[in-house]
Design a protein with these regions (language model features):
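Catalytic toxin/effector domains delivered as secreted proteins or via bacterial secretion systems
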Residues: 78-238
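Long, low-complexity, intrinsically disordered regions
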Residues: 16-127, 136
């Protein structure tokens, strides 16, 4: 098991072992989960598709006159305007308030340890985040299924295959210049949408690179994958 020197709490250095995050929906037995899997997936797709469509349409009314998601997406990456120029101020304030309870993101363990956990983020001093509450929801509903995690977070399918993933929690993102994403960030991919929502409807924002002492790292356990030499069997294969 790997160890990583982290600075936590009030900046006191401690040697901390990664905390493993497994399926938190323990109220369901394996038998119950297997029996309802197909029905649950079909129903979930129908409900969430309707929910996301309505959530996105609510954002549209907060674009300033003459601006829209399509008009912003038609501008090449690197030249897109600041969100404040096309989104109403009250919407931005309300959107960022959701991050008051903390923020989270996912990175690869290899990337984190490459620089000894010194800081997390892209070369342009940016890191995409979502609310801690919604990250909890994503990891709970995914049941350790990597493809589900990728889909929910707007990550191209297979991009994280064969990687050991680490959840990063940031208790106070506001202190790291919490802001709306412009779409010019290095981490903005082809699935990025103006307005602060992922394609699946979760809220996102951007902060500066996260230094030591400002985050907590937890290992994500995936079903059917090997993490640090420990194989985690698929739930449906358990007896």
């Amino acid at each position: 098991m790997s160890f990583l020197l982290l600075l936590v709490g009030l900046g006191q250095p401690v040697y901390g072992q990664y905390t493993s995050i497994q399926d938190t929906a323990r109220c369901l037995s394996v038998r119950d989960s297997s029996a309802t899997e197909a029905f649950g997936k079909n129903t979930d797709r129908q409900v969430t598709a309707y929910y996301y469509a309505n959530k996105a349409s609510l954002v549209d009314k907060y674009f300033r006159r003459g601006m829209s998601r399509i008009s912003i997406l038609n501008i090449p990456k690197g030249k897109r305007p600041a969100p404040e120029s096309y989104l109403k101020r009250r919407y931005i304030r309300r959107h960022l308030k959701y991050f008051k309870g903390g923020a989270s993101c996912i990175v690869s363990k290899a990337m984190l340890e490459r620089y000894d956990g010194d800081s997390i983020g892209k070369a342009d001093n940016s890191q995409f985040i979502m609310t801690k509450a919604e990250m909890d929801s994503v990891l709970t509903k995914s049941h350790g299924d990597l493809s589900c995690i990728e889909h929910e977070l707007g990550i191209p399918s297979g991009a994280w295959k064969h990687r050991v993933l680490v959840r990063i929690d940031i208790p106070k993102p506001k202190k790291l210049r919490l802001r709306m994403a412009s779409g010019n960030e290095v981490g903005a991919n082809v699935l990025w949408l103006p307005g602060g929502l992922l394609p699946t409807g979760y809220r996102e924002a951007v902060i500066d690179r996260i230094p030591k002492g400002k985050y907590k790292a937890s290992l994500i356990v995936l079903t059917g994958e090997v993490n640090d030499g420990l194989a985690v069997p698929n739930k449906n294969e358990q007896k």
